Amino acid sequence: MNYDKIKRSGILFLLGIGAITSLSCNDNDNGGYPERVPTRLSVMPLPERVDYKESVVTLPQNVTVSQNIPVSTSQLLKSTLEEKLSLSASDASNDHAFIQVQQESDLAKEAYRLTVTKEGACIYYSTETGLLWGIQTLRQALEQANFFTSGNSKYLPMVDIKDAPKYDWRGFHIDVVRHMFTVDYLKKVIDCLSFYKINKLHLHLTDDQGWRIEVKK
C-alpha cells in the first residue's frame, strides 16, 4: 500500500471528472472565461447539496486566511495554497480574510456549509470537526483550481455547498499483523483519510495473544 499513490489516484479521479464537466462547457456558458475555467467541482464524498452560481472568482496571489481558524487546521489550507498552487498565504482578521469562518450553533456536529463568492470563501460550522470537513472540501476545490488556469490566474467556481456525513462511522482498515508499516507511513495514511472525511482508523493489531515484531535478519 502506497500513501502517495492512494492520494494521487483520488486527486486524479476528482480532476478527471472536473475536466469532463468543465471542458464540456463553451465560453458562452461560463461568462466568457477561458474554457478551462471550472464551472463545476468534484468533491469526495459527494456533498448533500451543491448550488452553483454560474460564475467564478479569481484567486489572489496572496490568499489571506482567517486567524479564527485553529493553527493546525489553518496549516492544512496554507500548505495546499503554497505547495499545490504556488500562491502565498498569510493570516488576517476574520472580517478582512479571503477565507473566512463563521460559527453557527444550529448546524449538526459534523455539518458545514461552504460558500464561494466574489469576496472569497466562507465556512460555516458548529464544531471544530465540522470546520475541518469544510476545510477539506475547500482544499479539494483548491487543488482543482490548480488544474484550471488561464495565464497566471487560477479560478474557483462560485458555489454554495451544504454537507453533513450520512454515517457517523466511516472507517478504514489496516492489517498491521501480517504487514509491517512505519509510524510515519501510518501518519500519512491518517492525513489521507482526513482529506476524504474518513473518521475512523481500524488497526488490526493481533490475531492471538502474541505481538509480532519485524525481524529483518
Task: Describe each region flagged by the PLM.
Residues 25-170:
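Acidic, contiguous N-terminal accessory segments
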Residues 62, 68, 175-177, 206:
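Short strand-loop junctions, especially beta-strand C-caps/beta-turns
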Residues 11, 15-19:
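Hydrophobic helical h-region of N-terminal Sec-dependent signal peptides
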Residues 125, 170-183:
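The substrate-binding groove and active-site-proximal loops of carbohydrate-active enzymes
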Residues 185-208:
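Catalytic domains of carbohydrate-active enzymes, especially glycoside hydrolases
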Residues 165, 209-217:
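Aromatic- and acidic-residue-enriched carbohydrate-binding clefts of CAZyme catalytic domains
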Residues 20-24:
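C-terminal motif of bacterial Sec signal peptides marking the signal peptidase cleavage site
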